[in-house]
């Protein structure tokens, strides 16, 4: 590096390794630290459970909190997949996110969860940092985190954008030491009995949205307004029937009211978007975590 230079270093955290790097490359730096402007409101509850009872508690925890967007953390990939299978067999729509998935699969999984097409995401700690998903109203630590720093990042996925959130941690007899370490960091943790969980059997854990895939994106100069126009002025959807629109380099994803999904797949395949026809799929994830095309509709001219 030249001796005369201006260097700026930005980091979301300032741990020892970053501090060491900074001391080697920065010249008499001015350090600016930005604190949170708003107090984060996360209510934490801890439940002592038997390992064999964890899975059956999940639906009750969701219904008792009237949660619509749920992020469940496991320590191992195999636990994620097993829990996903079990919840799927209980009739719940779930996604999985861990390091065995390719980057494209991860991206699509995050899109399907963040646009509310799936209510439940089961993940390892690959999802605890760097994700910006609004409106996650319940975090469940199916496995207690390995340390208090990981716990902090996990529960930070809820209560974003100034909103409140709930974080629930399940722990067994073997986790007592880690529970005490976490409690030393967080003074407002409530120990609860599973007997006090009020399971609302009438509560339906479901999504009102589904996702369509369009094989065109930023590289084709597609914009959200182009897709919105094709859906509303083009085929007659109401804006309330359209959710989040995500546009990547070569693909676009649109959340659609599930009552309208068949209509959209049929009609949009015959409607030009910005003067061109595109292939239209419905996107979904199977129990193995693979993102699939449930229905394929395309119109070529």
Question: What kind of feature is each model-predicted range?
Answer:
Residues 31-33, 71, 88-102:
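Conserved RecA-like helicase motor-core motifs
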